[in-house]
Amino acid sequence: MNELDKNYSPNEIEEKWYKIWEDSKYFAASLSSEKENYSIVIPPPNVTGILHMGHVLNNSIQDTLIRYNRMTGKNTLWMPGCDHAGIATQNKVERKLAEDGLKKEDIGREKFLEMTWDWKEKYGGIITKQLRKLGASLDWDRERFTMDEGLSYAVRKIFNDLYHDGLIYQGEYMVNWCPSCGTALADDEVDHEEKDGHLWQIKYPVKDSDEYIIIATSRPETMLADVAVAVHPEDERYKHLIGKTLILPLVNREIPVIADEYVDKEFGTGALKITPAHDPNDYNLGKKYNLPIINMLTPDGKIVEDYPKYAGLDRFEARKKIVEDLKAQDLFIKTEHLHHAVGQCYRCQTVIEPRVSPQWFVKMKPLAEKALEVVRNGEVKILPKRMEKIYYNWLENIRDWCISRQIWWGHRIPAWYGPDRHVFVAMDEAEAKEQAKKHYGHDVELSQEEDVLDTWFSSALWPFSTMGWPEKTKELDLFYPTNTLVTGADIIFFWVARMIMFGMYELKKIPFKNVFFHGIVRDEIGRKMSKSLGNSPDPLDLIKEYGVDAIRFSMIYNTSQGQDVHFSTDLLGMGRNFANKIWNATRFVIMNLKGFDVKSVDKTKLDYELVDKWIISRLNETAKDVKDCLEKFELDNAAKAVYEFLRGDFCDWYVEIAKIRLYNDDEDKKISKLTAQYMLWTILEQGLRLLHPFMPFITEEIWQKIKVDGDTIMLQQYPVADDSLIDVKIEKSFEYIKEVVSSLRNIRAEKGISPAKPAKVVVSTSNSEELETLEKNELFIKKLANLEELTCGTDLEAPSQSSLRVAGNSSVYMILTGLLNNEAEIKKINEQLAKLEKELEPVNRKLSDEKFTSKAPQHIIDRELRIQKEYQDKIKKLKESLKSFEE
């Protein structure tokens, strides 16, 4: 046995072991293994991202599952990779350009893309290095990037297939537009936040009349693009104006008054301005009545040149100016408060603008049907189960997906335009030219679509594109469908549902069998962690302070299935203390195994005490519990089971009792000592295996010091429960001993008696099994509780001046004579009695008051009665204690 350093220094061992693991190819999946296969694909982090606490939780969970399945003898693949993150990455590069006073248009598309690839090469490896620091046992030789050539080919293939199957179409429609990112967004990329705003009431004069219609709007700047005013056909206020012409304020454009039942007579003034270019509902009304579409905003949210007075103003600046001008022309009535949901870009939180523009869409309903079916029939299992309802609701009400983005970084849409704008969708330009030649009868010049695909489009192929699809590969045969997807609930629509759709569409197979949604990591007061709030600690700083194992274990231990995690650094102290406890217990074990050779032990000659049988039973029970919990994705309960076994059962009890046997060198106790040594080694070695998936570094370091065979703990068999060794009767007997010892320790703590002072104890029990257990384990109890005398029997009298506790069916008395200052104790008890009796008085008065008891609700009376009984019980116990001191 090799000794451990005195102090546990996690940072030193982490770097050492990760390098050994990676260099030794322990993480690599085999393509020729006869073992059962188990696979997970990583939710690809943004290529320019850095590790945050959400990554820590997500990857700690995945690594725990992978390491557990690897140790159960499976051929595991954890597929690594990064996402190109179109908008996010482009924004970073554009900000870099802006430092030099440049825009991307100043350098052109080709140069900008070169610059973005350079940026990716420079910063793209940061997140993968950080995942290594976390101990993630990913198969790094298979690392993928969503814009690798193979994955790009897969994107073009599915686009072509969907298009030629009529599931991708192009058209001019109303979309969500982000003026900051300069691109369209899908519906689910818009976050709706409740905000306080205003309704402005404006006069719209009737042509050739003194009358006017009052319009209420939350976006007065859009009036520049109004083309009509709609009223309800049955609204008596406006019936006489239907068909009349209004003069649009400030613009002086003539617009009609139309009637439609869509208008809500009760909202605002009951008159609705129609702006088809800037509101989805108005857009639909505009199409219905064949109204013109007038655009008043540039793509970056400024007023267009058609309105010289406001041209170039930002939309919100224009709003102020327009309201001022309306007031100046006596066309403004008043402002009202409005609390409403405002759509914001999920990337940059800019208020989105509805905008009519040509875009590419995927028809979602046909794809959604299969995705619904595989969850309903149980092929794909979603955990926690409550997430199924959210999944169903979204898919049952799904809208077509806008997949085109007006940015440069990403997968350029594989569509080419002929001279007359006829579209040719192909795998590459050569194929598009072949199609064009067939269409036109001769060669023509083609221009490729400028837009790129939504980042989530390529991400939806991730489980199979990373394994070589559309080629037929060994990886797909062995590892697809994957077993488990671990992800945050916030991307159930962006990513999870779409992966199922695309997997079913192209491979006719589900992409994964289980989806495990974990919660969001929040701060201790429930806020989502973010840089802007300053409440998001740098995981690398935490790793330096606490060590990776402590962080991983603490995060998993404190994360209930599907619940958000309220994080504080206080949580990490538990993990660090646990690691130190295991380290120190191991040092003790190793120091007491000098000259011990586990291979030479004849197990048939060992002398197993109750404590040995108990720890064997608990080991097997824990192995069973951990397996059940991990397979149900209750990782927190699995971690708690390992913690309670190693910290509680092993360190706090077994090791302490083992000391009694280890320090006894009597000739007739040699077998007892050898048994204790063998059990310490066995339980520690098996316990390290149990703990390894959660805390890989410390377990490897310790295991290497005590191992008999093998190169690494990660390839050892995970402990398998032997039900025949789980003995409920044995456990009950030892739990009784723990209860007796704990009750005596509690008396010392409550009475302020030093643990170093030997005590006299009387245990009276009517239970023969308890009495037998006491008699057989008297030595252990006396040592653990520091007793000079232990008297056990049936129906023994309570000693005077003693403190009583109950353990099982036994009355446990600690004789306080000589341990306490009697006068001081009597004084303390009298003070406590006086305080409790004073607090009880108003409760008694209330319950003896007929007015209260006749009028108060029954649950209030019951509460007061419960309080009264609690006080009475406390007073009774104190009086009994006082009596024992006065005897």
From Swiss-Prot:
Q: Which residues form a coiled coil?
A: 817-887
Q: Which GO terms describe its molecular function?
A: aminoacyl-tRNA deacylase activity; ATP binding; valine-tRNA ligase activity
The places in or outside the cell where this protein is found are: Cytoplasm
Entry's SUPFAM superfamilies?
Anticodon-binding domain of a subclass of class I aminoacyl-tRNA synthetases (SSF47323), Nucleotidylyl transferase (SSF52374), tRNA-binding arm (SSF46589), ValRS/IleRS/LeuRS editing domain (SSF50677)
By its UniProt entry, which InterPro entries does this protein fall under? aa-tRNA-synth_I_CS, aa-tRNA-synth_Ia, Anticodon_Ia_Val, M/V/L/I-tRNA-synth_anticd-bd, Rossmann-like_a/b/a_fold, tRNA-bd_arm, tRNAsynth_Ia_anticodon-bd, Val-tRNA_synth_C_sf
Reaction it catalyzes = tRNA(Val) + L-valine + ATP = L-valyl-tRNA(Val) + AMP + diphosphate
* A Pfam match: Anticodon_1
Top-level division of the source organism's lineage = Bacteria
Where ATP binds, per the record, is at: 531
Motif stretch ('HIGH' region): 45-55
Motif 'KMSKS' region located where? Answer: 528-532
Q: How does it assemble?
A: Monomer.
Q: Member of which family?
A: Belongs to the class-I aminoacyl-tRNA synthetase family. ValS type 1 subfamily.
Return the protein name: Valine--tRNA ligase
Q: What organism does this protein naturally occur in?
A: Fusobacterium nucleatum subsp. nucleatum (strain ATCC 25586 / DSM 15643 / BCRC 10681 / CIP 101130 / JCM 8532 / KCTC 2640 / LMG 13131 / VPI 4355)
Q: Gene symbol?
A: valS
